[in-house]
């Protein structure tokens, strides 16, 4: 069992691996053509003479018994040519001197990130090959790669962990939050994964939203990782990654970050 960078000859095998993969993982390639584009992007990034972060990607595969059973990736300079949008969960304090009243409210608010960062993503393992340290190996290989060539990466490293979904693989948070802004027929489940930052910025007000009016099931899962992503979440924490208070716009999964030189 070992991890290496993806090669062009891996295209069909990678596509076979991910074609029936997790529909909620928006960074997974959607077609064989896109798989080939990702591999080419990775190869081009690796062969750059000027080794600095510049919208690069590195795609890795995990092989076991001569079979590709998992993939993962690194993306640099995220938000360099456009902002990244999250919800930031925080406390808003209100007070009245007249009535000697104070209260702390739990709110979420759109938060844009403009400074470039490196993102860890696209971690996917075949269901039959999950466990026994495979996910850790696939993920930790990225840290080793970054340690060998730190000049290729931004100083801030971010990992978005998938949030909770229902039995039909729909985002619990989005189901309850979005109904305040959009009709049910605006999106089907597949289209939700293609919602981009521009759409969010244009369609949702910038002021803070109280968490309390949301359905209780939606409130409870803000910033909580999906059960399948919990091992990855714990592994990232063991490597010194910490929550930055931001969550994904769609599934409200937690966002972790760490400085490149502080990763264990």
What positions do the PLM features span?
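Helix-loop element at the rim of GNAT/NAT acetyltransferase active sites that forms part
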Residues: 16-32, 42-50
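Conserved beta-strand in the GNAT
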Residues: 59-61, 67-76, 119
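Conserved GNAT acetyl-CoA-binding A-motif
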Residues: 113-123, 146-162, 172, 219-223
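Conserved acyl-donor/pantetheine-binding loop and adjacent beta-alpha core of acyl/acetyltransferases
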Residues: 76-122, 181-194
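Glycine- and acidic-residue-rich phosphate-binding/metal-coordinating active-site segment common to enzymes
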Residues: 138-141, 148-192
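Long, charge-rich C-terminal accessory regions
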Residues: 181-264
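Conserved acetyl-CoA-binding loop-helix of GNAT-fold acetyltransferases
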Residues: 125, 131-146
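A short beta-loop-alpha structural element at the N-terminal edge
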Residues: 2-14, 27
């Amino acid at each position: 069992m070992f991890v290496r960078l993806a090669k062009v000859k891996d295209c069909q095998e990678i596509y076979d691996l991910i074609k029936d993969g997790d529909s909620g993982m928006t960074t997974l390639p959607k077609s064989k053509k896109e798989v080939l584009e990702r591999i080419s992007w990775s190869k081009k990034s690796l062969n750059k003479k000027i080794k600095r972060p510049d919208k690069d990607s590195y795609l890795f595969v995990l092989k076991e018994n001569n079979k590709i059973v998992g993939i993962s990736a690194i993306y640099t300079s995220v938000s360099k040519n456009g902002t990244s949008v999250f919800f930031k969960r925080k406390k808003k304090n209100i007070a009245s001197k007249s009535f000697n009243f104070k209260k702390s409210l739990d709110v979420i608010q759109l938060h844009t990130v403009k400074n470039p960062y490196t993102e860890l993503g696209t971690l996917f393992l075949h269901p039959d090959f999950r466990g026994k340290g495979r996910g850790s190996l696939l993920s930790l290989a990225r840290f080793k790669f970054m340690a060998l060539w730190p000049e290729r990466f931004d100083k801030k490293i971010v990992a978005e962990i998938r949030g909770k979904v229902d039995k039909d693989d729909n985002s619990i948070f989005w189901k309850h939050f979005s109904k305040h802004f959009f009709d049910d027929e605006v999106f089907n489940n597949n289209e939700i994964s293609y919602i981009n930052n521009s759409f969010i910025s244009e369609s949702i007000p910038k002021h803070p939203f109280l968490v309390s009016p949301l359905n209780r099931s939606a409130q409870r899962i803000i910033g909580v990782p999906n059960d399948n992503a919990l091992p990855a979440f714990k592994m990232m924490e063991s490597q010194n990654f910490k929550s930055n208070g931001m969550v994904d716009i769609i599934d409200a999964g937690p966002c972790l970050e760490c400085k490149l030189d502080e990763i264990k």
